[in-house]
Amino acid sequence: MTDFLRDDIRFLGRILGEVIAEQEGQEVYELVEQARLTSFDIAKGNAEMDSLVQVFDGITPAKATPIARAFSHFALLANLAEDLHDEELREQALDAGDTPPDSTLDATWLKLNEGNVGAEAVADVLRNAEVAPVLTAHPTETRRRTVFDAQKWITTHMRERHALQSAEPTARTQSKLDEIEKNIRRRITILWQTALIRVARPRIEDEIEVGLRYYKLSLLEEIPRINRDVAVELRERFGEDVPLKPVVKPGSWIGGDHDGNPYVTAGTVEYSTRRAAETVLKYYARQLHSLEHELSLSDRMNEVTPQLLELADAGHNDVPSRVDEPYRRAVHGVRGRILATTAELIGEDAVEGVWFKVFTPYASPEEFLNDALTIDHSLRESNDVLIADDRLSVLISAIESFGFNLYSLDLRQNSESYEDVLTELFERAQVTANYRELSEEEKLEVLLKELRSPRPLIPHGSDEYSEVTDRELGIFRTASEAVKKFGPRMVPHCIISMASSVTDVLEPMVLLKEFGLIAANGDNPRGTVDVIPLFETIEDLRAGAGILGELWKIDLYRNYLLQRDNVQEVMLGYSDSNKDGGYFSANWALYDAELQLVELCRSAGVKLRLFHGRGGTVGRGGGPSYDAILAQPKGAVQGSVRITEQGEIISAKYGNPETARRNLEALVSATLEASLLDVSELTDHQRAYDIMSEISELSLKKYTSLVHEDQGFIDYFTQSTPLQEIGSLNIGSRPSSRKQTSSVEDLRAIPWVLSWSQSRVMLPGWFGVGTALEQWIGEGEQATQRIAELQTLNESWPFFTSVLDNMAQVMSKAELRLAKLYADLIPDREVAERVYSVIHEEYFLTKKMFCVITGSDDLLDDNPLLARSVQRRYPYLLPLNVIQVEMMRRYRKGDQSEQVSRNIQLTMNGLSTALRNSG
């Protein structure tokens, strides 16, 4: 840790401590300090965990609340200081002229140069380029805007403090530092007196607003900037023939993901699409208002194009002071039309005033873009390139990036639900009596007949369906209305989770056809929506390529693909595959599935686009996005990658413009490098694949023996983690299980991983790997040879390196001494001790095998920055865990008072903040 960062954390911690003493009293402050110092002693090995348990022995729920809040705030401020420090280190490296680090565009340009990548290859990749971060909801990401605002202001004041500390001191330096400290104290006081989390269970609408907040915080500005910068750079390096298309195209699941969530309805689809459009239209209006003030250029000073004059004359801005200012008059008219568009699409209440009513709304984003390009062209013709390259160029890039939709809203539902809906529709329409009971061949015949027929299934005005079917139909109906209003980019994807057959993929196409998103035309249907199978269990991942191969033999579907640019998108589920088969088996099943899909697409002449359903944690496919994309098989990226972003990962990546820029750059850099360069140094691919397959089977066997076969495991899991509390408290809008059952299979991936991370076991991110590696390596001379093989793979193959590195990262955040406290909550002591012993033994075996393969002495030897980060936040985590265990004990004994419930939520959110990737 650098002196600056240590100083910042101590500085912010001191102020927080003083605020706590002032607001809560000396007794609370002293208990916080005692817990903090004890935690540091434990971290240094100078005390046992029991000493912290003793600190909180007998603590009342009322006294526990400010302690939980204190350590949650410590974690929040430590994150803030760390982010600022990382940002400043990068700035210093740039100032020093250091070699650009990996995951930056500057580094990517150098690599493309060194790799002698030609313009034709770049152009080919960019024609279908799409880098799509897709924001999804998460139960612990419930921070309020007030908290974000406070963080933003504290960061601003800390930057001011650093600038003063780095500058030559003057007579006023100390007084300025005192003023900054006063401002920070004020903000921390406001933060302390603000509720960190909402009282009520968040509604879908609340989660939509949280997602939109990141656009206002960073993405509205940074996505257009990075798209503009990439386009300009590639044109300069590779020539005018390189297509200028926006690369980053954001998406969202919030409001459209109805898989297992009955609260997603037609109303949430309408709300999500309308609020997205309103957000981007108001952004355009603000930018145009600023441009109108900035572009004071007089036509007495320079010439303008006839097209610009025509636009100015249509601007209805004939005040005398602007008679010689055609740009202002032109922009005024464009702004009027955008406001008129907002009033038409969103409603007149969304726009202040009436002056815009003389203007005609834009019919499309393309019409708006043409007007902006008219202004741009005129500026460039008169040698005002510097002016054109500023705000106007960002606005043009924004229009190309966002249209009138801002993001693309995905619809997602599981295959079983689609089958249920069609069973009811087909029965009512007298197509077939019981579709669900038909064979696969019979279902296929029914579906193809319906897809070829323009006849609607639903009689006009009919509403006599079951509640579930009516809700599903309402979602598709509203999606169709949103597309008509905001354009085809508003809802361009329909995802089928748990897809395991050809008919699973075709079923939602019937519903899309019913509401006009697909038009029947014999074997040549036309549509604006990609139908995307999601393969997520180990079995389905293995079968995925075979399913697509059969699907592509159907002329109707193959022709539909052709009019969708011949692109087949496939979503890969990291979460359920991990829950199904464990960390290593899931990772290999995903990689192997990609190998098969790449080969299938190559032989069939179909373009592949992969959508990676990654969570925040390693157990759900998390880890650095840059490394994850580079770890894909050759041919799996091809300029396009979609990837889910959620929870604390969203706030960590996109909570401010600097981190947003960095993370968007990482996605684009990795996509370009994976598409255009050979990043793997494997010499014998088949041998590497055979090794992974063998280790995967051994890992699956170990994982299955505990998670799916041990009779006591379900009791251990449900009773030693906060799973019950996640289900019963107001944490997230989505139920924690798909069905009312206690099986691991039906449990949702987020509560599965979130529960293990809260109890500090982190089991989904490593269990089974140690045994698998030890058994595969064996003993004696064979062991020496096989260790060498694995060491070579770790040095030469990004996939294997990424698997090990991500595992080490998550294991470094585990703390089995705390896990033992959670295990003590289990009434059946035999189950508790037996399962804990299995977990404990496997953890240390996995750590040992990791060190053998990597040649390390500890988990994070190769990542000192992350190691220091984990060490810094460790002491803030311990008190939160100990308090959580005590509150869970009370809750389960019947004390389900608001104070106890609130403390459990506080500790869950505090731990999520400190861990930064909880579920």
UniProtKB/Swiss-Prot annotation:
InterPro entries: PEP_COase, PEP_COase_bac/pln-type, PEP_COase_Lys_AS, PEPCASE_His_AS, Pyrv/PenolPyrv_kinase-like_dom
Protein's GO biological process: carbon fixation; oxaloacetate metabolic process; tricarboxylic acid cycle
Domain of life: Bacteria
Chemical reaction(s) catalysed: oxaloacetate + phosphate = phosphoenolpyruvate + hydrogencarbonate
UniProt entry keywords in alphabetical sequence: Carbon dioxide fixation, Lyase, Magnesium
One GO cellular component, as annotated: cytosol
Active site, renumbered: 138, 579
Pfam families attached to this UniProt entry: PEPcase (PF00311)
Cofactor(s), by name: Mg(2+)
GO MF terms held by the record: magnesium ion binding; phosphoenolpyruvate carboxylase activity
EC number(s) given by UniProt: 4.1.1.31
PROSITE patterns xrefs: PEPCASE_1 (PS00781), PEPCASE_2 (PS00393)
Enzyme class: lyase
Cited function: Forms oxaloacetate, a four-carbon dicarboxylic acid source for the tricarboxylic acid cycle.
Family: Belongs to the PEPCase type 1 family.
PANTHER family per the UniProt record, alphabetical: PHOSPHOENOLPYRUVATE CARBOXYLASE
Protein name: Phosphoenolpyruvate carboxylase
Organism annotation: Corynebacterium glutamicum
